[in-house]
């Protein structure tokens, strides 16, 4: 699937594929999608998690099929047909079984509403945002959270940090932008175990940018921010837009900035580099994130 125009040059835009499950409307960032296939019979896997329908092999590549209705506790009625949305993120190829694909919409992250606590119950929520399209509400699903719930081993490798043991405390302040409550907590816990205790956590790029502007006015930005870690997908302002703003600002551009996202692939890496990101890592690589923070902060403070 052609995604060349997506999130280009930090425009704060994305394309959302709208699909349905039991006549409810949901969305996924097109950047995650490899292709869409018609339903094919799958081979069940013994003792698999209930949401895993089975496996199939398009073009000799084995792919696990996940039933989104099961994941969202929706009724699974009648004969299963529909479509498979084949995705790639966190270095995984997966198929999500849906009823129907409605179309693709280009939208701004600023138009995506952050779900409140009634929709997203903290770390248990599976929605990253809600957007109004053609008079209806479309829920943007947190596919990383859905997959991690099914198979925790696909998430952050917290064991990478635990194996290193406790480290000496480091007071270097880090500014974070991450919209997922679960991932935000996991990343924060891992950084604290690695000695980084001075963390300023924000729910999206706009919150992080506003903090940077506040510190600039105070004249304290270089005392309060020694490194920035940002996700890409976030409501209101995405990580690419935040990166562009930081690296275009004469007072902020020398602050090390790391993009830490499930979307980092070859194409997205090129976009991040063009915007000036100092490093880009995929989300399972939490151990590598800590190593990169060590290197960039050490280099900046010399």
Regions found by a protein language model. Name each.
Residues 240-253:
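Short amphipathic alpha-helix used as the core "switch/output" element in two-component signaling
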Residues 231, 261:
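Active-site residues of response regulator receiver
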Residues 23, 170-191, 228:
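Conserved acidic segment of CheY-like receiver
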Residues 201-227:
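Acidic, metal-coordinating helix/loop segments flanking the phosphotransfer/catalytic sites
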Residues 36-52, 101-132:
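Flexible, small-/acidic-enriched active-site or ligand-binding loops
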Residues 204, 238-241:
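Acidic catalytic/metal-coordinating carboxylates
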Residues 241, 264-282:
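Alpha4 helix (beta4-alpha4-beta5 surface) of REC/receiver domains from two-component response regulators
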Residues 60, 234:
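Receiver (REC) domain active-site loop signature in two-component systems and cognate sites
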């Amino acid at each position: 699937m052609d995604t060349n125009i997506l999130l280009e040059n930090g425009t704060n835009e994305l394309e959302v594929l709208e699909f349905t499950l039991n006549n409810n409307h949901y969305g996924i960032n097109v950047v995650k999608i490899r292709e869409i296939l018609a339903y094919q019979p799958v081979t069940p896997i013994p003792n698999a998690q209930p949401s895993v329908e089975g496996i199939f092999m398009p073009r000799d590549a084995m792919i696990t099929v996940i039933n989104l209705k099961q994941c969202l506790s929706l009724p699974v009625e009648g004969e299963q047909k529909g479509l498979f949305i084949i995705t790639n993120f966190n270095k995984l190829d997966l198929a999500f079984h849906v009823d129907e694909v409605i179309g693709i919409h280009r939208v701004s992250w600023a138009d995506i509403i952050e779900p409140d606590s009634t929709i997203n119950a903290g770390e248990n929520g599976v929605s990253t945002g809600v957007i109004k399209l053609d008079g209806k509400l479309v829920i943007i699903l947190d596919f990383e959270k859905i997959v991690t719930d099914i198979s925790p081993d696909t998430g952050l490798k917290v064991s990478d940090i635990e194996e290193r043991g406790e480290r000496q405390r480091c007071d270097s302040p880090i500014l974070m932008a991450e919209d997922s409550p679960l991932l935000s907590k996991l990343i924060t816990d891992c950084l604290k175990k690695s000695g980084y205790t001075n963390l300023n956590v924000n729910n999206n790029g706009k919150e992080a940018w506003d903090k940077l502007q506040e510190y600039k006015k105070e004249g304290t930005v270089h005392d309060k921010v020694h490194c920035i870690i940002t996700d890409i997908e976030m409501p209101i302002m995405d990580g690419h837009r935040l990166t562009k703003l930081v690296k275009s600002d004469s007072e902020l551009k020398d602050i090390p900035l790391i993009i830490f996202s499930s979307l980092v692939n070859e194409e997205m890496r090129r976009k991040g580099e063009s915007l000036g990101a100092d490093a880009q890592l995929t989300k399972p690589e939490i151990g590598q994130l800590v190593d990169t923070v060590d290197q960039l902060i050490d280099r900046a403070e010399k």
